């Protein structure tokens, strides 16, 4: 069997192989979280964050247009005003804002952790086809 055929078979096998997602590690922030740029969007009480560009249900002045350097993307938790930690406006009409359910990083942790994706790799012997 030619090298090209082996490579093609291996690529086809890998493409059809299922992927497994490893365990997720909770995101964390340093200091007061002003530099936090993760994608967490849930408050300490479990409420969903309102998008920074939205005025519903809460009108506010912290928009991405007015504060372009504060990372006010989507509805992600941020700290654009030097509060004690990352926060957001909530989608609950009765609760204007809350701190986010994030923890401060310990000294040996990074700012954002991403879940690992594991792709099983078959042995090369399984990819060979005997040709008579």
UniProtKB/Swiss-Prot annotation:
Region forming the signal peptide: 1-21
Compartments where found: Secreted
Principal location listed in the UniProt entry: secreted
Domain Kringle intervals: 27-105
InterPro entries found in the cross-reference section: Kringle, Kringle-like, Kringle_CS, Kringle_sf, Serine_protease_kringle
Pfam family, one: Kringle
Glycosylation sites: 101
SUPFAM superfamilies the record matches: Kringle-like
GO cellular component, one term: extracellular region
Tissue and organ expression note: Expressed in liver but not in other tissues tested.
Keywords: Disulfide bond, Glycoprotein, Kringle, Secreted, Signal
PROSITE patterns in UniProt: KRINGLE_1, KRINGLE_2
Disulfide bonds: 28-105, 49-88, 77-100
Domain notes: The signal sequence and the kringle domain are highly similar to the apolipoprotein(a) precursor protein. This protein is however much shorter and does not contain any peptidase region.
Official protein name in the record: Putative apolipoprotein(a)-like protein 2
Organism: Homo sapiens (Human)
Lineage of the species this protein comes from: Eukaryota, Metazoa, Chordata, Craniata, Vertebrata
